Amino acid sequence: MALFVRLLALALALALGPAATLAGPAKSPYQLVLQHSRLRGRQHGPNVCAVQKVIGTNRKYFTNCKQWYQRKICGKSTVISYECCPGYEKVPGEKGCPAALPLSNLYETLGVVGSTTTQLYTDRTEKLRPEMEGPGSFTIFAPSNEAWASLPAEVLDSLVSNVNIELLNALRYHMVGRRVLTDELKHGMTLTSMYQNSNIQIHHYPNGIVTVNCARLLKADHHATNGVVHLIDKVISTITNNIQQIIEIEDTFETLRAAVAASGLNTMLEGNGQYTLLAPTNEAFEKIPSETLNRILGDPEALRDLLNNHILKSAMCAEAIVAGLSVETLEGTTLEVGCSGDMLTINGKAIISNKDILATNGVIHYIDELLIPDSAKTLFELAAESDVSTAIDLFRQAGLGNHLSGSERLTLLAPLNSVFKDGTPPIDAHTRNLLRNHIIKDQLASKYLYHGQTLETLGGKKLRVFVYRNSLCIENSCIAAHDKRGRYGTLFTMDRVLTPPMGTVMDVLKGDNRFSMLVAAIQSAGLTETLNREGVYTVFAPTNEAFRALPPRERSRLLGDAKELANILKYHIGDEILVSGGIGALVRLKSLQGDKLEVSLKNNVVSVNKEPVAEPDIMATNGVVHVITNVLQPPANRPQERGDELADSALEIFKQASAFSRASQRSVRLAPVYQKLLERMKH
């Protein structure tokens, strides 16, 4: 009975445990990082925390999971050391840090956390030490000794030359008139300091970094009998101006100041809120070609997008960045903010020349390059940053440059440079027309395209959209990269030159002498009307050589039986359009005959029923034609399944003839005019 009771109690504890955990308060990011550091240090004894130190510096961080495995902070290697967690100390002869630190008053606790310089300056004032040692409840954000030592000499001199006013006020600004622990330090909050009730800005980032006026907490939550001490890495000062006021008084922001005024963003930048302004200097504007800069400054929408691309939705202090971080601007562009040693980077470039200029409504970082968003660019400017320079040169040579730099609403279908590895076509009337058919008469976004949609080109063609499981294609060409949406135009990067349809499937087959036997067979089987009318077909078209490679007996049987011939031909026709870019590892395509075709793509080679396609993607208005060098057999007609006496030998002849046909068919090709023009460029 006693055993049963114990088991029942254990079961209840297990059942209630998770519920109790869920009901408890969520830990702050700082506490979660501290907890991880404890876990990593527990092998060294109780209350031991793992700390990462950046090699060659005195910078230390409690370690999170990602940093633990990477062993890097801001790209610099780190070493792991093990220290007592906050609030604990070693005991001689004992493992780890088993003893809690004895509580003392704030003044004495400053010495415990290593802020002896703050103690020294406190002693110099007449009033502050008695307050720190007396009754009450306070929080002090105490600068480290290194923080005091790094102050400019003139600043330090001004403080110590008037200790009972300047120094006292500076120290009081680091204090709050109540106990505040890290769990209460919320991102974006302000605390009222003990100096003229001036605000202190608090930011608590998801990576566990906590900043006070952009100074990082080094050692937090050291309890005292009359409050708590947090050690920080900088001496902080009062914040008086908002972002707009700083822009107005700094000479290096003359151009930015004019741009902000013209855009109407000054109201936001002087209002409430918390922002990060990546503030371009005058030199940053001067680096932009005058034509581009004048165009943007003269376009209110582009100008607003440009400036919003330099504003983040919350305050981001430099100390919060310990690795690459994706952040979204007010304009909507994602920037990669990172660090390399002591330098901040944007999109991998060290363009921040001055950081952590604090404002009442955020923080400013000076940058030496303008961050022009796609939404403020022309199609030419979008293409300059993409792998489509060869295509852009062709558009320019063809006299289409005005369409790519003007204010027409267009979408450019630009093939990748790799498409032209074998050369580019001469610029003639056919090439110009082809290129015009790579420009859509509307500014599109790929996320709104749908299967079967038609798009009108500058060349007057109607192009179809095909949506597949893993690709989005326009005719035979598929989108190879994310859209770039500019001020008026959108850039689609395409995986090949687009071939507009030149006629129906029957027109395509009749126009190519490789298919004369297939055309005759289609006519004999009564399928001409089917392949001439509107529809969505995928035709695997056997060449003349494919028919000649059939065993004579098989060929005679087919040509002598219209019903059987129609059955075979329908097996070559899929009931939807499948271009090569839409083929995954394996697609089962239903044929008009009823059985399914197995279509696959491996190493950029399309195969149907495991036989390679000689030439894919000849587009027609009612489908697509893929050239094959063998005649496909429906499952019920294959020699092995019919028990044909000549099955083995016929199959061997078929394979040999198919191999010969694949080798020889290229010499007899007669392609439509666009395909001849692009023959050298096709994959």
Swiss-Prot record:
Phenotypic consequence of residue 544 to S: Found in lattice corneal dystrophy; unclassified form; late-onset
Position of motif Cell attachment site? 642-644
Induction summary? By TGF-beta.
The annotated consequence of residue 124 to S reads:
In CDGG1; late-onset; mild ocular irritation and reduction in visual acuity
Start and end residues of each EMI domain: 45-99
Phenotype upon changing residue 538 to R: In CDL1; delayed age of onset
Q: Which GO terms describe its biological process?
A: angiogenesis; cell adhesion; cell population proliferation; chondrocyte differentiation; extracellular matrix organization; negative regulation of cell adhesion; visual perception
The answer to keyword Signal applying to this record is: yes
| Annotated effect of mutating residue 555 to W | In CDGG1; common mutation in Europe and United States; rare in Japan
- Superkingdom assignment: Eukaryota
Query: Effect of altering residue 572 to R?
Result: In CDL1; late-onset
Annotated effect of mutating residue 539 to D: In lattice corneal dystrophy; unclassified form
Could you tell me which residues carry Phosphoserine?
Answer: 37
The UniProt GO MF terms for this protein read: cell adhesion molecule binding; collagen binding; extracellular matrix binding; extracellular matrix structural constituent; identical protein binding; integrin binding
Linked disorder?
Corneal dystrophy, epithelial basement membrane: A bilateral anterior corneal dystrophy characterized by grayish epithelial fingerprint lines, geographic map-like lines, and dots (or microcysts) on slit-lamp examination. Pathologic studies show abnormal, redundant basement membrane and intraepithelial lacunae filled with cellular debris. Corneal dystrophy, Groenouw type 1: A rare form of stromal corneal dystrophy characterized by multiple small deposits in the superficial central corneal stroma, and progressive visual impairment.
This molecule's function is given as: Plays a role in cell adhesion. May play a role in cell-collagen interactions.
What's the protein name? Transforming growth factor-beta-induced protein ig-h3
Higher taxonomy: Eukaryota, Metazoa, Chordata, Craniata, Vertebrata
The gene for this chain is: TGFBI
